[in-house]
Amino acid sequence: MDYEKIGFKAGLEIHQQLDTHKLFCKCQSAIKEDGNYSFGRFLRPTQSELGDVDKAALAEAKKNRYFLYTASDESTCLVEADEEPPHAANSEAIDICLTTAVLMNATLVDEIHFMRKIVIDGSNTGGFQRTALIAVGGKIDDVGIQIIALEEDAARKIEEKGRIVNYGLDRLGIPLIEIATGPDIKNPNHVKEIAERIGLLLRATGKTKRGLGTIRQDLNVSISKGERVEIKGIQSLSSLSKVAEKEVLRQIGLINIKEILKERIEKKDLEDIKLVDISSYLKDSKSNIVQKLLKEGCAKAFRLPGFKGLLKLNDTKLGKEFAVQANIITGIGGIIHSDELPGYGIEQKEVDELRAILQLKDNDALVIALGKENTVVNALKIVIEIAKKVIDGVPNEVRRALPDDTTEFMRPMPGAARMYPETDVQPIRVTKDHIDRIKNNLPEEPIEKHKRFMREYLINDEQTKQILSSGYEIDFEKLVKQFPEQKNVIIRTFLNTFSELEKEKIDTNVVDEKMLINIFSALTADKYSKEAIPEILKYLILNPKSSIEDAIKTCGLYATDSNKI
């Protein structure tokens, strides 16, 4: 595809956890699966400084959800519960952000002011997230950096059952650096390249966390006839380019649908749509789904002018979009459209009867909702509103990345009414002395480090990239200095053993400096042979409380005494 021709533009937002204590208290920033207390609350939208209410917050409030919070004394205090004012901002986290900004040649702010960003999806107990602008401007290669910010991470979602959502507070308050690029990214492959460059620069500070969930990437994508769409929660580098490609196809598909609808209908045709109760017509249906949902209430439907054949197209899947958005806001589970009928046990004769009742024309579709009457009515009204947006083309919205690299609706695009000043945290002056101290202690630039690794460790360009992108370069250098006679074994472990274990779905992110030192200390002491490293490493990852001696003994990997051979 010619991405320049279609006017492709993309910008990245990288959110990276910093390896320090929490942002507004001294609690450790470690994930604790088990909590020892819990509490719950409802959250409601508040007005901004100018008296406006953010539309994204309003959409969230309509879901009327109850939030249950699970916490541990080891990783949370009253600050996370929003029962105590925030303490002074974490100075180490601020310095990491300032260091990153200097490395990117960004312009630092004179004074750091924290703001409150309204978030009432339950991921923040106070109904807002604290965030502060650190720097503006800067560049990564040919891509501009718009902002560098410091913010607190959100709570970790544990489960969602109906209208009750359970969050863990262990993650809430972990410092995050946010780096947002300009819309200068030229194609999907370029997206991945820039994300890699930013990742290397962040790891150069030596103060970022590693592992699943410690870095999250949001992507803003638009094409010339489309709209800016923000895609949140892309977990891996490999998914970035695929998500961008599929979003382009989705937007092209929506633009094509817009053109088809222009030929079939006028906007006014969607203005006076009537809901029709079809419960009596489906009461004898052989469909198990229909019978189950009818017991909860009723079935209603409406004629959707001009949409026949447009609801199940591969790249857009409008029918699924109707169902997802209606479910997010109302909780409804039963939305059916005519492009997937006959189906779900609904037979062709029933479809024909419904088409006649609703007086469908050749190009018309029908949409059915089943369940409690109030829920059904609200859900169908939402579907009608979505259809009205589709006739205008690509909606400007926030979407969620899915495991197959497609996306689904998440919420409307937030506006300026989302932000207001944080009055509980004092402004922080960024003095010349402070900046000089940062500049005098800058880490090694990634490009220089790359050259040095190739020169010092006699490894090639691709091997160097692999080690530097793993996040283990600091451990690697420490091990080579401590065990110089094992240099080749250490290199082989980082280049081959780690990737082999990852292919077995073994999480190598739990490997730390202490574990590696114990492994190579025992090897140097001839307690086992170097061929056993993969098995020992695997055992210690799966049994993190075990010692190196336990691993050697359990795996039966004692080195053979050459004198006994």
Question: Model segments located where?
Answer:
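Charged, conformationally dynamic linker/hinge segments
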Residues: 437-444, 451
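Strongly charged, low-complexity linkers/loops
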Residues: 508-517, 530-565
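Extended, non-catalytic structural segments that build the interaction scaffolds
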Residues: 434-438, 478-485, 516-528
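Feature representing long, continuous alpha-helical segments
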Residues: 324, 474, 488, 492, ...
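Core structural elements
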Residues: 214-226, 292-302, 348-361, 418, ...
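Basic, nucleic-acid-interacting segments
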Residues: 1-435
